[in-house]
């Protein structure tokens, strides 16, 4: 099940790459276009399909990450404890949380081509700056799953700040574990926990 969720969240990452490219284009249209582009790249590039980590990371870095607001995601995941952190600690938390998400879901992005994605109509009032883009994802032998993206319109375009899989928020899932870590070991302990997890991923653990 965890593998499926990781694959779906990799799909969610893939669906956001071009959200800031054209302000007049609705976020759902941009999401659809970019999802198709990422799937096409994965299908055509044998190295990526084969799990070439260097190429996978390059794809994620160039097509996806610029359109996520990792600082806001980290702040939401850390929750009320964010205010306890110094500016330097906030920067460290954002850096390590970003690395955690990248490493976790880059490993699953090669599976995005296996899924069928249906994009739901977007109801966005004029002047709206916070939207929810909804999709339904399915795969042979698996019940359909809803993936929603929460996006905020910022000065430099639409930015994703949360992803929901079957109404389960990514930042909320992490908030529960982060709060537990802060209660036991403080902000510094949370940072060290993230550092260890990222080092373990780097070393193949």
Model-derived segments and spans:
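Surface-exposed, charged secondary-structure patches
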Residues: 103-145, 197-205
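Solvent-exposed loop/turn segments at secondary-structure junctions
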Residues: 82, 99-100, 124, 139, ...
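Low-complexity, intrinsically disordered terminal/linker segments enriched in charged
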Residues: 162-205
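Early exported N-terminus immediately downstream of N-terminal targeting peptides
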Residues: 24-105
């Amino acid at each position: 099940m965890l593998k499926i969720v990781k694959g779906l969240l990799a799909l969610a990452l893939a669906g956001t790459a071009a959200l800031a490219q054209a302000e007049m284009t609705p976020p759902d249209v941009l999401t659809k276009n970019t999802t198709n582009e990422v799937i096409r790249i994965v299908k055509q590039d044998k190295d990526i399909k084969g799990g070439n980590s260097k190429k996978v990371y390059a794809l994620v870095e160039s097509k996806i990450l610029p359109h996520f607001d990792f600082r806001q995601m980290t702040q939401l995941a850390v929750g009320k404890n964010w205010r306890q952190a110094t500016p330097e600690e906030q920067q460290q938390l954002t850096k390590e949380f970003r690395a955690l998400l990248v490493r976790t879901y880059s490993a699953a992005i090669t599976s995005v081509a296996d899924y069928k994605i249906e994009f739901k109509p977007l109801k966005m009032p004029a002047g709206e700056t916070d939207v929810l883009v909804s999709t339904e994802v399915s795969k042979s032998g698996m019940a359909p799953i809803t993936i929603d993206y929460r996006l905020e319109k910022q000065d430099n375009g639409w930015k994703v700040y949360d992803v929901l899989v079957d109404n389960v928020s990514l930042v909320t899932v992490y908030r529960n574990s982060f709060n537990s870590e802060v209660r036991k070991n403080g902000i510094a302990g949370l940072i060290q926990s993230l550092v260890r997890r990222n080092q373990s991923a780097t070393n193949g653990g």
